[in-house]
Amino acid sequence: MAIRKYKPTTPGRRGSSVSDFAEITRSTPEKSLVRPLHGRGGRNAHGRITTRHKGGGHKRAYRLIDFRRNDKDGVPAKVAHIEYDPNRTARIALLHYADGEKRYIIAPKGLAQGAPVESGAGADIKPGNNLPLRNIPTGTTIHAVELRPGGGAKMARSAGSSIQLLGKEGTYATLRMPSGEIRRVDVRCRASIGEVGNAEQSNINWGKAGRMRWKGKRPTVRGVVMNPVDHPHGGGEGKTSGGRHPVSPWGKPEGRTRKNKASDKLIVRRRRTGKNKR
């Protein structure tokens, strides 16, 4: 993938850029693997906003992605097409299996049209192949990793992301996450080889607010420019600082803490935050 920059023909075009989509080999998705996707606009079943800054955007169809791949062990497949998916930053690859079935997977870097792909404990260590962690050599770069055996890929699925397999001891494998966090995962969990493609996605300059609206993202408004009825920081004559420690629109202190999860005990080292990111 490469980035194509626009000429500054308008203020919105100045500095903006777009993917050149050079790796895309097909413009329409496989009909049997597409489902309708209805926008919720950030509302729940009662019609109340539960997630702010969502709504609008271009109409999309959801592509069914195979995140498990455990029922196709030993069945060879070929990459028929590399396609665009509006629901994620990564590209997707359409696989044609030898038994006649078609499925989508996340397209890793280096996977091209016509490439062979397989899954199972005996699969080769090549981009796109899917194996249990116990069968992957230490030091291998992987993506689409499961948190629980059979639960489907949960980690490292976005464009350019990858996880490094640091080691294996007993029933656990040690992984270095994209955030820098080091955690342990059951060796029966499956992962795909290689890093996710479309790594230049993060370098795209969107250029104008309208392109964000096409993606279904609404404006984020600061509390200090609202009225007192809308936010605890609102109101005041002229420009103010809010007059209190930062809080949410509902008065809760900014920077909330999170409850402990059962899987937290498997974290060896926390992710880098604040000054530690350097």
Swiss-Prot record:
It comes from Rhodococcus jostii (strain RHA1). The gene is rplB. Residues 37-58, 268-278 have a biased composition (Basic residues). InterPro entries: NA-bd_OB-fold, Rib_uL2_dom2, Ribosomal_uL2, Ribosomal_uL2_bac/org-type, Ribosomal_uL2_C, Ribosomal_uL2_CS, Ribosomal_uL2_dom3, Ribosomal_uL2_RNA-bd_dom. Keywords: Ribonucleoprotein, Ribosomal protein, RNA-binding, rRNA-binding. GO terms for cellular component: large ribosomal subunit. PANTHER family: LARGE RIBOSOMAL SUBUNIT PROTEIN UL2M, RIBOSOMAL PROTEIN L2. SUPFAM superfamilies: Nucleic acid-binding proteins (SSF50249), Translation proteins SH3-like domain (SSF50104). Residues 1-58, 225-278 are annotated as: Disordered. One of its GO terms (biological process) is cytoplasmic translation. One of the primary rRNA binding proteins. Required for association of the 30S and 50S subunits to form the 70S ribosome, for tRNA binding and peptide bond formation. It has been suggested to have peptidyltransferase activity; this is somewhat controversial. Makes several contacts with the 16S rRNA in the 70S ribosome. One of its GO terms (molecular function) is structural constituent of ribosome. PROSITE patterns: RIBOSOMAL_L2. Part of the 50S ribosomal subunit. Forms a bridge to the 30S subunit in the 70S ribosome. Belongs to the universal ribosomal protein uL2 family. This is Large ribosomal subunit protein uL2. SMART domains: Ribosomal_L2 (SM01383), Ribosomal_L2_C (SM01382). Residues 253-267 have a biased composition (Basic and acidic residues). HAMAP family: Ribosomal_uL2_B. The keyword Magnesium does not apply.
